[in-house]
Amino acid sequence: MKSKKGVVAISGSETEDDDTMDVPLDLSSSAGSGKRRRRGNLPKESVQILRDWLYEHRYNAYPSEQEKVLLSRQTHLSTLQVCNWFINARRRLLPDMLRKDGKDPNQFTISRRGTKLPEGSMVESSMGTKNFLPLLEESPFLPASATLSKTVSSSKPVSPGSVLARPSVICHTTVTALKDAPFHFCQPGDVGQTTDLQQPPANAFTDSSLSYHEDASKLGPGANAQSGLFNTPPPTPPDLNQDFSGFQLLVDVALKRAAEMELQAKLMA
């Protein structure tokens, strides 16, 4: 009897342990599987509206943005839900609809991809227009070159052929080329013309310096201290990057000074 009671007690404890172990495991597994497998299905009325639209537009089942908004209002769904439904419907429902009509589904998918090509061409055309923007941005620099040519022409007249060659140099170079290396991107014919433009200011400056030497020799040794500034050798031809306005001011001041010195020499005589 004792052994039977002990066996009964042990068996009862084992069943209790099994119940306590099984219950939480079953609940957790069922709860976890319920959370994982649960899917929110759309309302039947909304799905029917979307199916009707898909069947009417089965040969081109790609709604526009306005049509998506209209369908979202009719079905009381968000536009994201409408887009996702059409993405899945084109893969699952649309091929069967087309096969019932005796059509090949692959033909309509290919035709849709073909219609997307104009969008790529639009992108290429927009990129092409961007490539022309630097040429339009170079136009503000043309007045600066015009003023530079005016200063060169004011110091000494230049032939009209060399003056007209200056805009061609700007057209064949970029803004960075004018700042860094203006001669590397120019045409071979234009390089010689640019050197012709550089030569007249140097000649004009040497002519003015010679006149200053003659005035200084006429005035005598007393004026050597004042004319010492003009005994320097002629400078090298300036680059295109230099500003000629400073040279123009120096020439004007020097001419005025020379005129004053000539008046003083005449008065002393």
From Swiss-Prot:
Cell compartment(s), UniProt: Nucleus
GO biological process: negative regulation of DNA-templated transcription; negative regulation of transcription by RNA polymerase II
One GO CC term, this protein: nucleus
Predominant localisation class: nucleus
Function statement: Binds to the F' element of the APOVLDLII gene and represses its transcription.
Keyword vocabulary terms for this entry: DNA-binding, Homeobox, Nucleus, Repressor, Transcription, Transcription regulation
Regions that span the bilayer: none
Keyword Metal-binding (UniProt): no
PROSITE patterns registered for this protein in UniProt: HOMEOBOX_2
Gene Ontology MF, one: DNA-binding transcription repressor activity, RNA polymerase II-specific
Protein name: Homeobox protein AKR
Positions of the UniProt region annotated as Disordered: 1-41, 213-236
Regions recorded as binding DNA: 35-97
Family (UniProt): Belongs to the TALE/TGIF homeobox family.
